[in-house]
Amino acid sequence: MDLGIALPILANIDVKDQLQIAIKAEELGFKSVWASDHIVIPKEWKGRFSDIFPDPFIILTAISQNTKKIKIGTSAIILPYRNPIIVAKMCSTLDHFCDGRLTCTVAPGWMKEEFDVLNISYDGRIDKTVEYIKVLKSLWEDDPTDFKGNFYSFNDVSFQPKPIQKHLPVWMGGNHEKAIQRSIDYADGWQPIWFSSDELEIKMKYLKQYAEEKERNLDNFSISLRNRIRITQKSDKNSGHPPTALIGKKNEVYDKILSYRRLDIKEVVLDFITPDKEEIIETLEMLGNELIPEL
């Protein structure tokens, strides 16, 4: 099992800080770095939700040019917000910049107020997500390619450059069973958030059962969990966060991370919940020097 990081999206962490954190993560042996996606944060959400969201494709391009081996990924691109043909072009170009290190996690989105600001139908987001995944794969893998859908159709078009990877991985975000179904039906992996190891074990049993029903081979299917982390001097019981979060004293956090190892998942991606860059670097060094060698 590997450890990855999500780029911090908290106040006081700017894009240059994010770049430095990604470079440090690679130096310390972390295997992946992920960029989140929101375009606007409506006023009613400000204060309850971070509004520091650089464009994921631009920040990942910068990271790709300052690192050599760490995997990079979107987590998760909200597909209905963008023209999927343009997303396909951005991803394929980025895959060249990073020499084939890209994974594209996608999701249908959840913040209705953001859909409203962008003048995009909230109700149609699931159907669009499914169709847009098909558009991405059609453009990346076939040439010339034809596609006929409810939202996009094209005939005999050429799309270049193709990604470096012959099969650029598309993972599905989301915690609900419907998200699991979409990941099995249309994607190459599943990336939920915030589950404890016991909760994730239950979800994985459902995933395997559904995959068996659909006769989906899971040999090349990846599972990656995102969870919040902060190492403090206080017990996790006093953190004020849900008990599923990786928050508390160092030994408590380490034990929680190690508990996922029995599930045979690809990685745990760490979401830092402190706005202090130095604390984030200190935590990276602690994990890189003490926990990653054990994994």
Residue ranges and their predicted role:
Residues 26-27, 60-68, 91, 95-101, ...:
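Acidic (Asp/Glu)-rich catalytic clusters
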Residues 8-10, 38-40, 77-79, 107-111, ...:
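Active-site beta-loop-alpha junctions enriched in small/polar residues
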Residues 1-66, 168, 273, 278, ...:
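N-terminal beta1-alpha1-beta2 module of alpha/beta enzyme domains
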Residues 13-25, 90, 172-182, 246-260:
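Short, acidic/polar
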Residues 3-7, 33-35, 72-74, 102-106, ...:
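Hydrophobic faces of well-ordered beta-strands that scaffold small-molecule active sites
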Residues 43-47, 83-186, 205-206, 213, ...:
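Internal, glycine-rich beta/alpha segment that forms the wall or movable "lid"
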Residues 4-15, 75-85, 165-175, 237-251:
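Active-site mouth loops of central-metabolism enzymes
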Residues 31, 123-159, 163, 193-295:
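An alpha-helical appendage that flanks or caps ligand/catalytic pockets
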